[in-house]
Amino acid sequence: AFNDGKLEPAVVVPINGSPQDIAMSLSGKQCAVASPWSRQVTLVALENGTEGQTLPRKTAEARLPFAPGLQAFCRDDTLLVVADAFGGQLALVDPRNGKLLGTRLIEAHGIRGLAASRDGKSLHLSHQRIESAAPTTRNRVFWGQVISNILRSISVDHLLEDDGKRSGGAKLVAHWSLYPFGSPSKAAGDPGAVTVGTLGTTMVALGGVDRIGLRPKPGHVFEEIEVGDRPVAIALGPLERYGYVANFFDDSISVVDTAAAEVVRTISLGPERKLSSAEKGEKLFYDAKLSLDGWYSCHSCHPDGHTHGQLNDNLGDDTYGTPKRVPTLLGTSNTGPWGWIGNRTTLWEQVEKSIETTMRGGKPEPPTVEALVAYLELFDTSPPGNAAVDSSAVARGRQVFERLKCSKCHRPPTYTNVGTYDVGLQDETGQGFYNPPSLKGLQHRSSFLHDNRAATLSGALELHQPVSIRSLRRTDHADLLSF
């Protein structure tokens, strides 16, 4: 409600698991709420009260096999498409009952734009795609061969097809049209919000480089336009004459004349204040211009501080040809040393090396590193999920963990330590000694071990096989996984 110039809550609906995205149905009679950490989508009916007020009512909850992010209603509100908050999966949900109809997989991570065409026949996604085998040499980064920035359009009919071809339980999406953003010397890191008008106007936020892409009709080339600092949301006005772009870091709205393809007005949302070191670090974290030509930012591989879960060949272990899983940064300030082989003893050193050799942005100035470190120190571990947990199994699992002396490598409270250990899993160069990753937030990882060779935690234990686990009873094994 809007009272005396202030917005106030009119009705509060409890939603589990730290909700982060809301999508409205085309009719306006329903919304969907995504909660990434609990891997849940909550469906809410928006009913009219006797006095004209809106009365929200939870109608269903959909449990997903991945963390949900953006959502879009399609097909006259009979289909809800839910995008992966970190990786490249899509879920198809029946919004009438919350039933999961299936999951789909595309070669993607960082899906930050999702919009259905007005006729409901196509779905448009902005995302990035990493080439895990491509080393982060200057030449590879320059040509956009490490991370590409993409607008992908997929037929909704094709999404609903099921030919049985699967990868890890999800059907592979085989047909699409693809538009790559960026070119050498003028890349377009971190594509974000997408809006598609009824007349065919399409606008895409290029958040990492402070530009938007604009095309008047499908099939036309996008024209890139400079806007404010990190555009994150876009709306089209009547007759699509103007587009309105919300810029996150400078608190402004850019008004774009879509015919002239230029900003005609900038609306300030208030005076900017002096930023703390951590706030400066936040701006840098989302700034693709920190990399060579602007191909990608820290956020590209560590979406909102977490991880896209894929491999990157970035000299983290001082070698090429040995791609490793990108780790989460949540809680990272407490889990040193850094790097899979523990070869960075300070977070400062890790940040500096990442900018130089992963992003090829040159040697950063000390204030840049200082600000990024200050921002990373704010990252707490990811919250627990809300899935039903057997507390007695967790308690028994803790006892198994202690009895097997798992804490020798994974010491509470961070569940890691400063050493390196031979775990019997060598990389391409024969390297077998690794610094144990923290076990905090383990339930929010989609793959395990340094090269993602294990798709489940149980599979990781089978491959890792510490001596103490090899003769473990099945019930103790299950309890350990619960813990």
Question: Where would I find each of the regions flagged by the language model?
Answer:
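Beta-propeller blade repeat segments, especially FG-GAP/WD-type strand-to-loop junctions
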Residues: 1-5, 43-48, 217
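Surface loop/turn motifs at the tips and blade-to-blade linkers of beta-strand repeat domains
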Residues: 12-16, 61-66, 104-107, 182-186, ...
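A structural motif specific to WD40 beta-propellers
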Residues: 8-10, 52, 57-59, 101-102, ...
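Short, solvent-exposed loop/turn segments that connect beta-strands within catalytic domains
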Residues: 5-6, 49-55, 78, 121, ...
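Periplasmic c-type cytochrome electron-transfer domains
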Residues: 40, 74, 88, 93-98, ...
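Contiguous, function-dense segments enriched for cysteine-driven chemistry
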Residues: 1, 17, 34-41, 61-62, ...
